[in-house]
Amino acid sequence: MLTDPIADMLTRIRNAHLALHKEVSVPRSKMKESLAAILKQEGYIEDVATEEGSIKLTLKYFKGKPVISGLKRVSKPGRRVYVGMHEIPKVQNGLGICILSTSRGVMDGNSAHESKVGGELLCEIW
């Protein structure tokens, strides 16, 4: 049994990119679907397909190199990290995104700042 399914998803994406795989499959949950939708919206992955019990992510490459250079899980089950609206970090000086779980759902840092909400800082992607 997994203790941190979000970290597992990020690790699967990282490993698939390092192995230059075209697709990766992760077990399905609402939180992971929201994360995948944000990654697609921000241009880090090409496509998201939900199948019964799993989510299939089509990874994106530019000139043979992965579009995602790094993934970092911030808030972990043993140490939760919460940020207010004014404390949302800029990832890699604005070249990356952070993803938050807010009272209005899962959203990236820019959307959370525009909506004037803070929340749990799930991960950073650059």
Curated annotation (Swiss-Prot):
One of its GO terms (biological process) is translation. It comes from the Bacteria. Keywords: Ribonucleoprotein, Ribosomal protein, RNA-binding, rRNA-binding. Signal peptide: none annotated. InterPro entries: Ribosomal_uS8, Ribosomal_uS8_CS, Ribosomal_uS8_sf. One of its GO terms (molecular function) is rRNA binding. One of its GO terms (cellular component) is ribonucleoprotein complex. One of the primary rRNA binding proteins, it binds directly to 16S rRNA central domain where it helps coordinate assembly of the platform of the 30S subunit. Belongs to the universal ribosomal protein uS8 family. HAMAP family: Ribosomal_uS8_B. NCBIfam families: PRK00136.1. Part of the 30S ribosomal subunit. Contacts proteins S5 and S12. This is Small ribosomal subunit protein uS8. It comes from Nitratidesulfovibrio vulgaris (strain ATCC 29579 / DSM 644 / CCUG 34227 / NCIMB 8303 / VKM B-1760 / Hildenborough) (Desulfovibrio vulgaris).
